[in-house]
C-alpha cells in the first residue's frame, strides 16, 4: 500500500487562536505551560501498491494546493510512504510549501 501523509500548519507569523486556547487550557489544568502551541491538520490517504509514486505525488501536490491548503495562511508537508505487509515503512517522496 502507498500512503500519503499530509501535514497542514499555519504559516509562522499567523495568529493561532486554537493553539493559544490549548496552551491556556494546559496551564489551567495544571500542566506545564508551553512556550508556543501551534495547531494544524494531519491527513492520511491510502492508495493501491501498484500506484506510480511520481505521478501520485504530483497529483497529491495539486490536491494540497487546490483543496487542502489556504496558501495565504497555511503551509504543508507531503510524504509518500510505501507500507509493506509486515508493516515496514519506506519514504518514497517528500515535499512541501
Residue positions per predicted region:
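Non-catalytic terminal accessory/regulatory regions of metabolic enzymes
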Residues: 1-97
Amino acid at each position: 500500500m502507498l500512503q500519503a501523509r499530509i501535514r497542514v500548519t499555519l504559516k509562522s507569523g499567523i495568529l493561532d487562536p486554537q493553539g493559544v486556547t490549548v496552551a491556556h487550557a494546559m496551564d489551567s489544568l495544571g500542566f506545564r505551560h508551553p512556550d508556543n502551541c501551534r495547531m494544524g491538520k494531519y491527513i492520511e490517504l491510502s492508495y493501491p501498491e501498484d500506484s506510480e509514486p511520481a505521478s501520485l505525488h504530483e497529483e497529491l501536490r495539486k490536491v494540497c494546493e487546490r483543496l487542502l491548503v489556504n496558501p495565504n495562511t497555511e503551509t504543508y508537508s507531503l510524504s509518500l510512504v510505501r507500507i509493506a505487509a509486515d508493516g515496514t515503512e519506506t519514504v518514497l517522496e517528500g515535499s512541501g510549501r
